[in-house]
């Protein structure tokens, strides 16, 4: 009581959410990444860049939680034209034909902004350790392209490892150029993972942080 009267009460301990940057300015709490994903499971590149500029690698990794798939390139080619009614085409995957005359793949600025953390949306259902990928709703990573199958592939988180298996897709799932079957294959940091014509780089939070910081 005497301490209260004299204004000698202990100052509250500073929590992680009340941390400060090098300049002494307070930083906003990092928040929950699952609440920052859009309906397709993506998170904004600019948001991540700002966070990487303010927070250290440990704090950033705590926020991201899991590895991410970062858009890299689109393979040159075209979707095969098929004589089907429009309603049928909406429900079926179209075969992707590689264009041998074009470069193997081309960089896409819009795809580079496609970053999918292996984290379920706050409203998502299903088992926590399974991360389904496909063209339609119900997947954690949604790619609305006819080259992508409805249930294209699944990534499984198993005791700190990340395993991917193809779901019997029309245009295939690839790791570093090798087509997969339904047998699970481990993905490692900086592997190139492709779904049909779309290529992504698989990055652990530490590698994502370094990429965003330009290291």
Protein language model features and the residues they cover:
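Residue-level signature for short turns and capping positions that connect secondary-structure elements
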Residues: 74, 138, 148, 160, ...
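Surface-exposed loop and edge beta-strand positions of immunoglobulin-like domains
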Residues: 144-146, 165
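C-terminal boundary/linker segments immediately following FHA domains
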Residues: 174-215
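A structural connector/turn signal
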Residues: 138, 143, 150, 180-182, ...
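Exposed loop/turn and edge beta-strand positions of beta-sandwich/beta-sheet ligand-binding modules
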Residues: 127, 158, 181
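Short hydrophobic/aromatic patches on the structural cores and recognition surfaces of FHA
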Residues: 133, 151-156, 160-175, 190-192, ...
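Intrinsically disordered, low-complexity acidic Ser/Thr-rich regulatory segments
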Residues: 1-143, 206-215
């Amino acid at each position: 009581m005497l301490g209260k009267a004299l204004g000698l009460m202990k100052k509250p301990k500073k929590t992680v959410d009340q941390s400060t940057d090098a300049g002494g300015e307070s930083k906003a709490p990092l928040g929950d990444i699952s609440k920052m994903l859009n309906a397709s499971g993506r998170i904004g590149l600019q948001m991540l860049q700002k966070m990487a500029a303010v927070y250290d690698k440990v704090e950033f990794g705590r926020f991201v939680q899991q590895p991410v798939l970062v858009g890299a390139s689109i393979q040159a080619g075209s979707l095969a034209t098929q004589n089907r009614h429009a309603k049928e085409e909406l429900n079926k995957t179209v075969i992707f034909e590689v264009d041998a005359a074009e470069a193997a793949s081309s960089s896409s600025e819009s795809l580079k902004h496609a970053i999918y953390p292996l984290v379920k949306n706050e409203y998502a259902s299903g088992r926590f350790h399974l991360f389904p990928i496909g063209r339609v709703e119900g997947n954690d990573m949604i790619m609305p392209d006819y080259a992508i199958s409805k249930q294209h592939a699944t990534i499984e988180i198993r005791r700190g490892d990340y395993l991917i298996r193809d779901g019997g897709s029309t245009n295939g799932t690839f790791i570093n150029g090798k087509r997969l079957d339904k047998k699970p294959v481990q993905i490692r940091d900086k592997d190139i993972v492709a779904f049909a014509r779309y290529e992504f780089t698989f990055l652990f939070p530490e590698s994502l942080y370094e990429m965003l910081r330009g290291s």
